[in-house]
């Protein structure tokens, strides 16, 4: 059995590594802004004037401030968002 690679990990990693400013919309309508400092399976650490730990289950949408490209899967499929 092969391990299925997550789509969100490469996307979040590019945003973190390149320090791309993002807007994060929560399911309750709140809009947060900052740079992704770190993330794991359950949370994203967002840095602005303060650090905020955001649970992924509370997130509706993540919008980068610019176009980002990243690779997904073993075949190295190139994706632009």
Swiss-Prot record:
- Which residue numbers delimit the Sm domain? 9-68
User: What are the GO cellular component annotations?
Assistant: cytosol
UniProt-listed InterPro entries: Hfq, LSM_dom_sf, Sm
Q: Which UniProt keywords apply?
A: RNA-binding, Stress response
- Which Pfam families does the entry link to? Hfq
Coiled coil (UniProt feature): none
Q: Which molecular function term from Gene Ontology is one that the record holds?
A: RNA binding
Q: Which GO terms describe its biological process?
A: regulation of DNA-templated transcription; regulation of RNA stability; regulation of translation, ncRNA-mediated
Q: Which residues cross the membrane?
A: none
HAMAP family documented for this protein: Hfq
Similarity comment text for this entry: Belongs to the Hfq family.
What is known about what this protein does?
RNA chaperone that binds small regulatory RNA (sRNAs) and mRNAs to facilitate mRNA translational regulation in response to envelope stress, environmental stress and changes in metabolite concentrations. Also binds with high specificity to tRNAs.
Quote the subunit structure annotation.
Homohexamer.
What name has this protein been given in UniProt?
RNA-binding protein Hfq
């Amino acid at each position: 059995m092969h391990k299925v690679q997550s789509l969100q990990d490469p996307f979040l990693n590019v945003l973190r590594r390149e320090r791309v400013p993002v807007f994060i919309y929560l399911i309750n309508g709140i809009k947060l802004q900052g740079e992704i400092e770190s993330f794991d399976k359950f949370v994203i650490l967002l840095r602005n004037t303060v650090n905020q730990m955001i649970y992924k289950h509370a997130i509706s949408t993540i919008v980068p401030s610019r176009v980002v490209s990243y690779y997904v899967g073993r075949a190295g499929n190139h994706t632009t968002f």
